Every structure is written in C-alpha cells, then in structure tokens.
C-alpha cells in the first residue's frame, strides 16, 4: 500500500500543499488518540460555553479546535483559518499561500455515546490582496477548493480526501503512524435504495421534500416501485462516508422551525468539502436551487440546504422541485 506523500505526488499535488495536508493530518492523529482514550483521556462531557452557532461545546470540541489552531498557525503555510468554533477567521502568516476552513469535530453529540465522529477540512488558495484575518478572504466558491477531506474516527481512523484528481481512501497505520492509501478513485453508485435524513423534522419541510420522502417510504407499493432503507448516524462524516462506500442520498433540507434560519449545515466547512469529495467520486451535491460549489459565500458561517449523493437519486429528488 502506498503512503500519503507518494500518492499525492502521483496526482501532481504541489509540495507546499502536501506539507500543509501533512500538517492537518498531524492534528487529526492526536485527535484520534484522544478519541480512543474516551473517559480515560478526561475529554468527555460538555463545557458551559456555546460556540458561534449557539451550540453547547463538548470538551473534545474545544480540545480539537485548539489543536488545529496551534498546529496550523505555527506552520507558516496558512494565511488564515476559519473554524466552526471561532466567531471570525484567525490570522496566520501574512505570506501563507493557503487558507483552511474546518469543523474540528463533526457529530460531537456522538462523543459521549462512543459513536462516529470526524474532522472536516477545506483548503483554498489565499487571495494576495486581502489581509490575513479579514473574513472576506474566505468568500470563495467551493469550486475553487484545492483540497478537501475528512478524517473519520471509527473502528479504524480513515482519511477521505481529494485534490481534484479523484476521491481516495486512506487508513491510519497505527504501527508506523502514517496514512496508507487503500482505495483510489472511489466511485459512488449512480442508483441507490438508501436515504439519510433526520425524519424528526419532517413536519417542517417544504412540500417537494415532503412528497419525495413520502414516495420513498411508500416502497414497492408506491410510485417508486421499490423499497428504500433509511440510515441516520447524526454525524455528516458518517452518513457521507456510507454514501461514498455504497451509494445513497443524504439531505438536510430547508425547514420552517426557525424562519430566520431555514438551513442547518454550514457551507464553508461542511457542504463545500463534502460536495468536492462527492463530485470527484461521480456523485452530485446540490441545493434545491443549484450546485453547492457554485454558491458565492456571504459569510464564513453561512448555512445552506444540502441534497447530495448518488447521481440519479439526487436528480430524482430535485425533480420534485420543478
């Protein structure tokens, strides 16, 4: 099995970007260890604080965020970072070539029940004409990403990443401490009989999504004439990983619970990186109005509707909106 750096060089990834990726992964290795320690590592439970999203922070959220901040800002590779846990972007090296957006611990509500969690990251080139620390630096569409990926802390620690030359799977070799390539050019099946959605919000959805899900639930006696299974891990990294492995559709649709905030997932460090990974694997990543990676961001914490996964099923879902 091929090690990370040679695999990236094979895809003609620039050496400075390889170095930045390795820096990010150094932080994820430490997080993986902390996660594996569980209660023994004294990082379980919640803090008394809320992040910018209004979410109560888990202790491991804070630990993971500080790890990423420290290692990235000291690297010299990044001009600025933005995190789910930070109100604004944080300035790095004014001469840094890249900017990094990340969710240090996706699915943190799963920590205390020992279920799937992960880290999501997205890398863009840094604009030269905007000062480090200015949030406007991050207002770039997803199709300008130079790298995106996530690290899934499960039975094994897996890296799923793309630099624009396909989506590849790596596994952390704990014996030697490096990530090894285990599957190159993953392809998402175009058709599926699995869907992932938080059904507890169904009554708040718009009519097109209500109708689409109702037809899935009707199974082989309904208009789709086949049965569908529902899966829901409550961590985007876990649900998208299943889609990448065996197909499916994942959606977090618009809802009316909070009219001033109809969307749940964040564009910069959740939707965009997952969209890049899925498109590179032959899938689709959309809102009900268009392609996710075409969206021009208006803030680093912007939220969006998400409909992504197997190509034919995403297109079928979108047909309900026409």
UniProtKB/Swiss-Prot annotation:
It catalyses: beta-D-fructose 1,6-bisphosphate + H2O = beta-D-fructose 6-phosphate + phosphate. Signal peptide: none annotated. Mg(2+) 1 binds at residues 84, 103, 105. GO terms for molecular function: fructose 1,6-bisphosphate 1-phosphatase activity; magnesium ion binding. SUPFAM superfamilies: Carbohydrate phosphatase. Binds 2 magnesium ions per subunit. Belongs to the FBPase class 1 family. NCBIfam families: PRK09293.1-3, PRK09293.1-4. This is Fructose-1,6-bisphosphatase class 1. It comes from Colwellia psychrerythraea (strain 34H / ATCC BAA-681).
């Amino acid at each position: 099995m091929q090690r990370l750096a040679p695999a990236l060089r094979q895809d003609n990834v620039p050496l400075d970007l390889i170095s930045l990726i390795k820096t990010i992964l150094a932080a994820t290795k430490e997080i993986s260890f902390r996660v594996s320690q569980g209660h023994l590592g004294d990082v379980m439970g919640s803090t008394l604080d809320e992040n910018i999203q209004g979410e109560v922070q888990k202790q491991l959220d804070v630990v993971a965020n500080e790890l990423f901040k420290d290692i990235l800002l000291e690297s010299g590779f990044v001009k600025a970072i933005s995190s789910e846990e930070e109100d604004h972007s944080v300035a790095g090296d004014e001469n840094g070539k890249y900017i990094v957006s990340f969710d240090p611990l996706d699915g943190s509500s799963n920590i205390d029940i020992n279920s799937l969690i992960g880290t999501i990251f997205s890398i863009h080139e840094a604009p030269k004409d905007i000062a480090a620390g200015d949030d406007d630096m991050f207002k770039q569409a997803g199709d300008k990403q130079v790298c995106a990926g996530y690290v899934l802390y499960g039975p094994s620690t897996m890296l799923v990443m793309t630099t624009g030359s396909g989506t590849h799977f790596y596994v952390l070799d704990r014996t030697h401490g490096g990530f090894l390539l285990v599957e190159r050019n993953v392809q998402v099946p175009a058709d599926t009989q699995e869907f992932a959605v938080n059904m507890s919000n169904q009554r708040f959805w718009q009519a097109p999504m209500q109708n689409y899900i109702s037809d899935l639930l009707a199974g082989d006696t309904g208009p789709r004439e086949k049965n569908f299974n529902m899966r829901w891990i409550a961590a985007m990294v876990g649900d998208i990983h299943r889609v990448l492995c065996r197909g499916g559709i994942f959606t977090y649709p618009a809802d009316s619970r909070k009219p001033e905030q109809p969307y749940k997932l964040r564009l910069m460090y959740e939707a965009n990186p997952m969209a890049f990974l899925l498109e590179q694997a032959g899938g689709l990543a959309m809102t009900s109005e268009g392609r996710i990676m075409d969206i021009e961001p208006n803030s680093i914490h912007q939220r969006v509707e998400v409909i992504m996964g197997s190509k034919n099923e995403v297109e079928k879902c979108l047909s309900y909106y026409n």
